[in-house]
Amino acid sequence: MLFRSAELDFLRQYVAIEQARFEDRLTVQFAIDPDTEDAPVPNFLLQPLVENSIRHGIGPRPGPGHVWVTARRVGDSLRLEVRDDGVGVDAGRLSDLEHGVGLSNTRSRLAHLYGDRHRFTVTRPPEGGLAVAIEIPMDEPAREASDAELLAEGAA
């Protein structure tokens, strides 16, 4: 379990590598509410979402693309969102996306760590691209999973 600030430090390092690969084709913007800095966040929660945005949204796009990462407090919850202006998907395929490895692993981790105290949504913003939003309890650490539990969950 990391604090949101440490998770973002890791994410910024990952983004720097991707920006070196994509050069001028990739812009990533962070809009982080300072009130969320001490919120506990599971390790590597956002990286797979940003990776999906870059790989499946921006990568196939012919021109430059943008990814936005936001964190803000909504009531008693921390709302994290990764949104891109990439190629997006048809409405009929939206539910299929949640069964991809990155999104399904993230959804499973959230269910294991927070039970019904989380929300995970994938939407198509009106301006295009894709958005993934996560809401988790702001001041309540997630249930820690042992390595054996995580391995068993991955095998299921």
What are these regions (language model features)?
Residues 125-156:
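C-terminal end segment of the histidine kinase catalytic
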